[in-house]
Design a protein with these regions (language model features):
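Mg2+-dependent endonuclease catalytic cores in nucleic-acid-processing enzymes, primarily RNase H-like
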Residues: 1-104, 155-178
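Acidic two-metal-ion nuclease catalytic site recognized across multiple nuclease folds
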Residues: 93-178
Length: 178
């Protein structure tokens, strides 16, 4: 996994890496930090970021960090783009959400969504969707100086002469995904 992350850093000139701290992610985070790679550890089950609600009281809009970053991804997709990848599309549409009594959004657990979709005859890899959504766990402006809503991560003087395609080279960089 670390080798794949290093390839992607080189290919996309990534300045920061967000890694799921659950499961085997802790070891990946430790190794990347040993190599001097800036890493943000994301715990999907941790608390969501509070926002100012009515009467200037801070209140979480989401049940946990996972629901929050999936919600941020959903909002971005209204104006963003996805690679032509049916597996990713199915995975992003997989988990159901519901509103809890305290008016916070909760996503169906990864395990429950996978079980339900399998019973319905749909198989997909939820890790693919989590990989996209985890990119919304950090404020890209804060760490990269790049506004995530702009088309290119390049500075004006180093901007390429062709249109920026964030998915160019993706299949070559990650052949094991397809």
């Amino acid at each position: 996994v670390v080798d794949l992350v290093l390839k992607c850093i080189s290919l996309y000139r990534t300045r920061l890496v967000a890694v799921d701290g659950g499961g085997v992610g802790g070891g990946v985070i430790d190794r990347l930090r040993q190599l001097g790679i800036p890493v943000i550890e994301v715990q999907f089950g941790s608390k969501a970021t509070p926002h100012l609600a009515a009467h200037n009281r801070e209140k979480a809009r989401y049940f946990n960090k996972r629901a929050e970053i999936w919600g941020s991804c959903r909002d971005w997709l209204r104006g963003g783009a996805l690679p032509d990848d049916p597996q990713l599309l199915e995975a992003l549409c997989g988990p159901k959400q519901h509103i809890r009594s305290e008016d916070v959004v909760q996503l169906e657990s990864k395990e429950d969504a996978t079980d339900r979709m399998t019973r319905e005859g749909i198989t997909y890899d939820m890790d693919v969707a989590d990989a996209l959504c985890i990119t919304f766990a950090i404020d890209s402006d804060l760490y990269t100086g790049v506004n995530a809503l702009h088309n290119s991560p390049f500075d004006e003087e180093e901007s390429p002469s062709v249109d920026y395609n964030p998915f160019a080279g993706l299949r070559e960089a990650m052949p094991s995904v397809h």
